[in-house]
Amino acid sequence: MPNQPSGQTFVLLRPGYSTRHIAAELKSNGIIRSEDAFILWHYLHHGRSLKAGEYLFEKSGSLVDIHNRLARGDVYFHTVVVPDGFTMFDIARAIEAAGLGSAEDFLKIARTDTTLIADIAPGANSLEGYLFPDTYEFSRMMTMQEMAAAMVKQFRQVARQIGLIQSPGGETAGGGPPDVDANATPIPEVTARLVPTPDERLERTVIMASIIEKETAVAEERPQVASVYYNRLQKRIALDADPSIIYAELLAGTYTGALHHDDMQFNSPYNTYRSAGLPPGPIASPGKSALEAAMHPSTTDYLYFVADAAGHHRFARTIEEHNKNVAAYRRAMRGQ
């Protein structure tokens, strides 16, 4: 049970409880003084159905008010906040912290049950990326699948607002450049995901948006970050996105909280240092801004970017220019 305010008590009434069982639970928690009085009131007022769920009661509530709340089903809702960039692992921990069940149980749904998105993302290997960031109100009686479904529903709503999904039937719009440069020189391990089919366009956009989301929290930079990655895809240059390594290690259960140079060789299709093209799935839940950036990247010839001391990024067209930006960042960090 969650922490309850002073003078208030949580009571969980499970499906199938009889009126007498409900009265006994209320009495044992100090909500009512007499089980018989509650039962008598219930039957004198046409025996209205009492709803299962978790309730938060004031110790001083009247019998009439208590009965009416149960008849209306005024259950208690727990707030679960999902910020932009949360992974399914983060969401699972947030649900557990709210007292709504175990993180492990939520992950079982998020990692395997793709039926919730089968019509819009048939190639998805999990719900990662489609559990939309927002503030949710969940009751204790909701299943993990119902919670996941609420997040997917919000994704669909926002995706329609921005034109990523064109209709309730699931027709999708593409994001980013439509083709790869046919004259580019391939690099090892390039994958077929570089040229998505129409059915893969939404999935590609969500994958790209998730990388953009994890790379920068500065909304106005996101279209530029998107342009860097789309330019690299067109030229068949590996994305080299550090957040993809972190996610690869999260999936493997080996992430220690920090990246080291050796991690760039971590063997996973999600590691965009080792595998060219997009990873096989999103690496986080992108927010609206990141989705829009993935759909509408800036038109640039940038191929590199690095953080600066102010929390923004410096963009570069050549490796020489990029190396100068990296050196400037390191000098700034040493001077702090």
Residue map of PLM features:
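Signal peptide-directed extracytoplasmic domains
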Residues: 1-161, 190
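Bacterial extracytoplasmic/cell-wall-associated proteins, especially those involved in peptidoglycan
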Residues: 97-101, 115-336
